[in-house]
């Protein structure tokens, strides 16, 4: 093990970024470069030999799985949708939301003989949910505003991430089932855990202690 080796941490851009930075600052890491990004792609904490990279959620999984990053911070939604090979080591208790089934108020989950159409950004999560219920559905992959699908009769219902439910209510949609809770997770590359066990375990423990204090 090289104690001076730089540990690379991949952070999810967007809603989880701020929460992750707050956590790392509170365990003593220097995240100042992340607050003055400019056009930089890699952000350094020279004192602690840490590099941060900001990438889209699916790419966090890819970077960590292939060893381009040692540690990743990503939402459980992405982990459930994209099965990859790494260690999931911590629930960070931030970025909390849930997967929910929603539609217009007249929707009936088990009524009728027609195969239901379900619109979602998360086809694998949706497929598994209905498989467990023994319901055969057609899944329509949507990249944009999923809430439009039942309103425009593209789909009977949607499966999407819900934080407050405000967007659903504003569009006349109702939650029919909460599928599972979601929050930010810490993941670690398998080889990195062996090669840099002491340093990575130290980071994990410090983050765990902080999360437990704040929970």
From Swiss-Prot:
GO CC, sorted alphabetically, is: cytoplasm
Annotated EC: 2.4.2.17
State the NCBIfam families in the record: hisG
In Swiss-Prot or TrEMBL terms, this protein is called ATP phosphoribosyltransferase
Q: Respond yes or no to whether keyword Glycosyltransferase is given for this record.
A: yes
Q: What class of enzyme is it?
A: transferase
Can you tell me which family this protein belongs to? Belongs to the ATP phosphoribosyltransferase family. Short subfamily.
Concerning PROSITE patterns, the annotation shows: ATP_P_PHORIBOSYLTR
| Coiled coil (residue ranges) | none
Q: Name one GO biological process term.
A: L-histidine biosynthetic process
Write out the catalysed reaction: 1-(5-phospho-beta-D-ribosyl)-ATP + diphosphate = 5-phospho-alpha-D-ribose 1-diphosphate + ATP
What broad class describes the main subcellular location of this protein?
A: cytoplasm
Source lineage: Bacteria, Bacillati, Bacillota, Clostridia, Eubacteriales
* UniProt free text on domains: Lacks the C-terminal regulatory region which is replaced by HisZ.
Known partners and oligomeric status = Heteromultimer composed of HisG and HisZ subunits.
């Amino acid at each position: 093990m090289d104690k001076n080796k730089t540990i690379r941490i991949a952070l999810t851009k967007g809603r989880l970024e701020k929460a992750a930075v707050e956590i790392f600052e509170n365990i003593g890491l220097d995240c100042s470069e992340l607050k003055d990004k400019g056009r930089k792609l890699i952000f350094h904490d020279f004192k602690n030999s840490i590099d941060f990279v900001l990438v889209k959620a699916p790419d966090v999984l890819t970077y960590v799985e292939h060893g381009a990053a040692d540690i990743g911070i990503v939402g459980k939604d992405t982990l459930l949708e994209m099965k990859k090979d790494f260690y999931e080591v911590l629930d960070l208790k931030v970025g909390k939301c849930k997967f929910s089934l929603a539609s217009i108020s007249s929707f009936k989950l088990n009524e009728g003989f027609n195969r239901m159409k379900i619109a979602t950004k998360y086809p694998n999560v949706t497929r598994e949910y209905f498989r467990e219920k023994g319901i055969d559905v057609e899944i329509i992959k949507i990249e944009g505003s999923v809430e439009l699908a039942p309103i425009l009769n593209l789909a009977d219902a949607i499966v999407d991430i819900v934080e407050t439910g405000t967007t659903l209510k504003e569009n006349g949609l109702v939650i029919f089932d909460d599928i599972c809770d979601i929050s930010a997770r810490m993941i670690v590359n398998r080889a990195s855990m062996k090669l840099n066990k002491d340093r990575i375990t130290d980071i994990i423990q410090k983050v765990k202690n902080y999360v437990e204090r704040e929970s």
